């Protein structure tokens, strides 16, 4: 997914980020909790206003407002880095070798120990109430 090149702190954004290879990593409640806890943490530490989020089996949608001090790219980097580490550790603790093999194999391609998220993210300006309502439904 491409990174949004221009960031306007006056806008709300509809952001989507996906699991590597669109693998269904986010089915377990414990994995969802890692994502939710991280989003709530970013609300306070990165002055991010979180309006709505939904966790699908292989991707996450969020509607957020970011501050100038902590732009979208920085927040997404921190979110993905932290959650990747926690999600990988959880799969290790669970002994889920099938998922660990996929994450390790994808990591090797880019000279990392593992890879949980696809590169980049998609961010769209929430340009109207209708667009916002459509994404919230």
Language-model segment annotations:
Residues 1-137:
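Short catalytic/metal-binding and nucleic-acid-binding patches
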């Amino acid at each position: 997914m491409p990174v949004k090149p221009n960031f306007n702190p006056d806008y709300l954004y509809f952001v989507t980020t996906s699991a590597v290879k669109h693998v269904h990593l986010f089915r377990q409640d414990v994995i969802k909790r890692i994502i939710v806890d991280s989003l709530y943490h970013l609300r306070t530490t990165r002055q991010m206003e979180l309006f709505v989020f939904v966790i699908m089996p292989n991707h996450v949608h969020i509607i957020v407002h970011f501050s100038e001090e902590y732009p979208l790219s920085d927040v997404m980097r921190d979110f993905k880095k932290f959650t990747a580490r926690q999600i990988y550790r959880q799969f290790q603790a669970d002994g889920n070798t099938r998922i660990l093999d996929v994450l390790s194999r994808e990591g090797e391609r880019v000279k990392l120990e593992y890879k949980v998220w696809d590169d980049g993210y998609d961010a769209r300006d929430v340009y109207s109430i209708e667009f916002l309502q459509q994404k919230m439904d």
